């Protein structure tokens, strides 16, 4: 479009022969709005039509009718009939089983009184049985360390620990390592040495090192019934280098005696006429000299030495 045509659109007044671009700019600035509006009106109509088309609502992708129908299907039906229980006899039919209940008559009080008297007579005739049990009749050999060490050096074998749990006797034996081939046995009797059994001991690995001594363990099951008049004794035999070394508790043997538990909880040993042996007197505390020549009381220095229950926590003796 030329400058002349542009000025005629903006201002219909007659123009001079020559029109410069400056004239067009002046006419644009000074021209009234109606001619400019009439010039831009086609673009406004086009923009208005497109804006209307853009504001049209989109169609929803959700089907509201189907959701409403699904909710109606889940609603509980109130038109269903309620369930009722009807007995067969009400319709003239026979029942499967008939139970008749009646009130129990109350027992008179005087009957209860006689029942209590009978119960009292029965309880008065009952007697608590006295329980008989077995216990060790010797102290733990390792409790007195000095005596244990002297006994071990003298006999080359010594009972170290012993315990009695229910009907099983368990313990350990310490022997000198005199040869590679060796055997340790427990000789035990349950009938006052009319017969005896030799039970082999098992070798225990020395976890503390050292080769001067070895340790053996044993476990002996006692018979279920042992008459109280019979002696239960045992001793230790050690076989090495073609010789046999004995530990018989200085000639007294290691004894297991019967004890009696009274109903009041008192523990007493069986009488001498009922049992063929009596309890040995407790050993007296003696002063013994150590290797350094100073006398010491073993029971005072070692009141709680290693016992069978503490074997896993303390080192073995040398």
Curated annotation (Swiss-Prot):
Ubiquitinated by NHLRC1/malin in a EPM2A/laforin-dependent manner. Transmembrane segments: none annotated. The keyword Ubl conjugation applies. Residues 141-263 are annotated as: Interaction with EPM2A. GO terms for cellular component: cytosol; protein phosphatase type 1 complex. A motif (PP1-binding motif) lies at residues 84-87. InterPro entries: CBM21_dom, CBM21_dom_sf, Pase-1_reg-su_3B/C/D_met, PP1_3C, PP1_regulatory_subunit_3. Interacts with PPP1CC catalytic subunit of PP1 and associates with glycogen. Forms complexes with glycogen phosphorylase, glycogen synthase and phosphorylase kinase which is necessary for its regulation of PP1 activity. Also interacts with EPM2A/laforin. Acts as a glycogen-targeting subunit for PP1 and regulates its activity. Activates glycogen synthase, reduces glycogen phosphorylase activity and limits glycogen breakdown. Dramatically increases basal and insulin-stimulated glycogen synthesis upon overexpression in a variety of cell types. This is Protein phosphatase 1 regulatory subunit 3C. The lineage of its organism: Eukaryota, Metazoa, Chordata, Craniata, Vertebrata. The gene is PPP1R3C.
């Amino acid at each position: 479009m030329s400058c002349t045509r542009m000025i005629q659109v903006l201002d219909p007044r007659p123009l001079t022969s020559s029109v410069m671009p400056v004239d067009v700019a002046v006419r644009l600035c000074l021209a009234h709005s109606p001619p400019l509006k009439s010039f831009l009106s086609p673009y406004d109509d086009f923009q208005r039509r497109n804006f209307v088309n853009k504001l049209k609502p989109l169609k929803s992708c959700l089907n509201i009718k189907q959701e409403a129908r699904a909710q109606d299907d889940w609603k509980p039906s109130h038109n269903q009939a309620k369930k009722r229980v009807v007995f067969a006899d009400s319709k003239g039919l026979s029942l499967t089983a008939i139970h008749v209940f009646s009130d129990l008559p109350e027992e008179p009080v005087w009957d209860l009184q006689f029942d209590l008297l009978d119960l009292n007579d029965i309880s008065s005739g009952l007697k608590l049985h006295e329980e008989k049990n077995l216990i060790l009749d010797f102290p733990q050999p390792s409790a007195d360390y000095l005596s244990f060490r002297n006994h071990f050096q003298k006999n080359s074998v010594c009972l170290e620990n012993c315990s009695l749990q229910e009907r099983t006797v368990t313990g350990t034996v310490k022997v000198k390592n005199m040869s590679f081939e060796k055997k340790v046995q427990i000789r035990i009797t349950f009938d006052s040495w009319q017969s005896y059994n030799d039970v082999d001991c098992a070798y225990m690995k020395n976890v503390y090192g050292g080769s001067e001594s070895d340790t053996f363990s044993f476990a002996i099951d006692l018979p279920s019934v042992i008459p109280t008049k019979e002696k239960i004794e045992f001793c230790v035999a050690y076989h090495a280098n073609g010789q046999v070394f004995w530990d018989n508790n200085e000639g007294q043997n290691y004894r297991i005696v019967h004890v009696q538990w009274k109903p009041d909880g008192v523990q007493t040993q069986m009488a001498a006429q009922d049992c063929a042996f009596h309890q040995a007197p407790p050993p007296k505390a003696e002063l013994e000299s150590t290797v350094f020549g100073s006398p010491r009381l073993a029971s005072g220095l070692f009141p709680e030495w290693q016992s069978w229950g503490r074997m896993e926590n303390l080192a073995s003796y040398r």
